[in-house]
């Protein structure tokens, strides 16, 4: 466990085959970003992976309370790092950031068939 916070000793389940899991959205995100000469700071407005009960590799929209729970972390990260531009990936993130008064450019979320649009929209964001 890392600092007693993560790992099996802290109550988290680990991959049974010893390999880390690959989440679909993260895979698309990193494959798209790898093609660009830019290393972003990535963070979810919902700090945990929302999934359907009993299906940890599924996706579902986060509940309002789950999104609200992430506001403090987003604000801390923006204060900690010299963030020049915020890009919201998807409407959920864009709406949350707007509600919190954080200026952001919103691009299509890559899930549910949005991979191509995500890449195209990200490529047109000025200032990256």
Q: Could you say what each language-model-derived stretch is?
A:
Residues 1-85, 95-100, 105, 112:
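A polyanion-binding, active-site-adjacent surface
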Residues 91-92:
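Alpha-helix/helix-capping structural signal
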Residues 101-128:
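Short, flexible loop segments at boundaries between secondary-structure elements
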């Amino acid at each position: 466990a890392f600092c007693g916070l993560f790992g099996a000793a802290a109550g988290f389940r680990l991959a049974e085959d010893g390999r880390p899991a690959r989440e679909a959205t993260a895979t698309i995100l990193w494959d798209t970003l790898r093609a660009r000469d830019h290393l972003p700071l990535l963070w979810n407005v919902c700090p945990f992976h929302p999934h359907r009960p009993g299906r940890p590799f599924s996706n579902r929209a986060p509940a309002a309370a789950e999104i609200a729970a992430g506001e403090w972390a987003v604000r801390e990260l923006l204060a900690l790092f010299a963030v020049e531009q915020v890009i919201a990936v998807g409407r959920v993130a864009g709406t949350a950031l707007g509600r919190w008064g954080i200026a952001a450019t919103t691009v299509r979320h890559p899930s549910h068939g949005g991979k191509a649009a995500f890449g195209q929209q990200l490529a047109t964001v000025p200032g990256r």
